[in-house]
């Protein structure tokens, strides 16, 4: 199986499980590859790290939730695996150049 196909399959699996605790250890165990080899293969195929991919997917899901629901920001953060609303807000702001609250209200 090609590296491209392996990573495509892993991305599909990650996307299905994005609301669960995911990190390199979990994904490496699922893939059957070492952490080092998986990171190298993932970066070669996608041009980003596995951690960056997971973080971006979670933030995109959060952005959709903020746009389409009135759910509390705290609940969105917790559902996406962040340990606190403050951590979530800091990471969200780094990605979108505004806080989750500003993002929700400026649409």
Curated annotation (Swiss-Prot):
Residue ranges annotated for the HTH araC/xylS-type domain, each copy included: 8-106
GO molecular function terms noted in the UniProt entry: bacterial-type RNA polymerase holo enzyme binding; cis-regulatory region sequence-specific DNA binding; DNA-binding transcription factor activity; sequence-specific DNA binding
DNA-binding region: 25-46, 73-96
Principal cellular location given in the protein's record: cytoplasm
An annotated GO cellular component: cytosol
GO biological process annotation, one example: regulation of DNA-templated transcription
Induction: By paraquat.
The UniProt record lists the keyword NADP: no
Location of the protein in the cell: Cytoplasm
Keywords linked to the UniProt accession: Activator, Cytoplasm, DNA-binding, Transcription, Transcription regulation
Matches recorded under NCBIfam families: PRK10219.1
Function, as annotated: Transcriptional activator of the superoxide response regulon of E.coli that includes at least 10 genes such as sodA, nfo, zwf and micF. Binds the DNA sequence 5'-GCACN(7)CAA-3'. It also facilitates the subsequent binding of RNA polymerase to the micF and the nfo promoters.
Database matches in PANTHER family: REGULATORY PROTEIN SOXS, RIGHT ORIGIN-BINDING PROTEIN
Protein name: Regulatory protein SoxS
Gene encoding the protein: soxS
